[in-house]
Amino acid sequence: MVLTKYKAAAVTSEPCWFDLEGGVRKTIDFINEAGQAGCKLVAFPEVWIPGYPYWMWKVTYQQSLPMLKKYRENAMAVDSDEFRRIRRAARDNQIYVSLGFAEIDHATLYLAQALIDPTGEVINHRRKIKPTHVEKLVYGDGAGDTFMSVTPTELGRLGQLNCWENMNPFLKSLNVSMGEQIHIAAWPIYPGKETLKYPDPATNVADPASDLVTPAYAIETGTWTLAPFQRLSVEGLKKNTPEGVEPETDPSTYNGHARIYRPDGSLVVRPDKDFDGLLFVDIDLNECHLTKALADFAGHYMRPDLIRLLVDTSRKELVTEVDRNGGIVQYSTRERLGLNTPLENDKEGKK
């Protein structure tokens, strides 16, 4: 049975830069805080663990190499003890967790999102389909079986997208077609519009993401939309600056960009620039009714006889295996990573 009214939270905080263990501990602390506050859902920013590598937008190739090595060393695998600890925290607090993290799989990093349910099971695991611009120097592409967003839950049909995926009209259409009701628009760290320098387009600063793209998503889909954002401190600026380069001294432009919007695009809450913590919202799924009554692009306000979207969720392998009957052995990324295996009922989980 779907709950129609419940409390949720979006994280706006500074990551533990280049620190997997610290990031896991801070994640668990926020899960505990949200659970103690009575939340049924807590949402984290894009690549919250081990932080968004914003330095890649600002440094040369040679300058990036020591930071890239350290970043990769602190990425998180889904079959790791660190990830299982986060799953246990979700189970202990009986809460849904939408987690953004830099996932390492073999030797490639991905901009990953996991949706963990109150039993600690991973009910959705996805990867950003296309890293944005210089992100391609750090991350790989998601595959056909790792990009679906919307998952049926007891909180409603919940979707997740990373950063500029939230303005991708095709992904938005796909989510609408699945009846999305709650959306996690996970964003990284971004400077504000006051830093914009010609000819860099305004698309590339935080304000349009917070105040144009995210409410537009809410309006067009008729969903409750939570936009968790990372923050930055003076110390964080130093950690994200290579040796020999003078770091910035004022982090304020990077802060205060998290938002929560109602299904009609109206603002629920925005933080002050100095706020670090959880933004809370009381969700009522019944508020989706009138927005979708006006414009349901998956139903009465669409013409599939004229416009349709083709979706391919199959995984394309570099190497395929032939079975004894001459067919191709099929398996999913989820199976290979062991995400179909239930979280063990171990002693640590009972603490």
Swiss-Prot record:
Induction note: By cyanide.
Broad enzyme group: lyase
Variation of activity with pH: Optimum pH is 6-7. Active fom pH 5 to pH 9.
Secretion signal, residue range per the UniProt entry: none
SUPFAM superfamilies assigned to the protein according to its UniProt record, in alphabetical order: Carbon-nitrogen hydrolase
Pfam family of the protein (one): CN_hydrolase
InterPro entries hit by this protein: C-N_Hydrolase (IPR003010), C-N_Hydrolase_sf (IPR036526), CN_hydrolase (IPR037544), Nitrilase/CN_hydratase_CS (IPR000132), Nitrilases_CHs (IPR044149)
Active site: E46, K128, C163
EC number assigned by the record: 4.2.1.66
GO BP term (any one): cyanide catabolic process
Molecular function terms from GO: cyanide hydratase activity; nitrilase activity
Annotated catalysed reactions: formamide = hydrogen cyanide + H2O
Domain named CN hydrolase: residues: 6-285
Record keywords: Hydrolase, Lyase
Subunit structure, interactors included: Oligomer of dimers, forming left-handed helical fibers with a diameter of 13 nm but with lengths ranging from approximately 1 um at the leading edge of the peak to having approximately the same length and diameter at the trailing edge.
Similarity-based family: Belongs to the carbon-nitrogen hydrolase superfamily. Nitrilase family.
Function: Catalyzes the hydration of cyanide to formamide. Degradation of cyanide may be important for plant pathogenic fungi in infection of cyanogenic plants.
Protein name: Cyanide hydratase
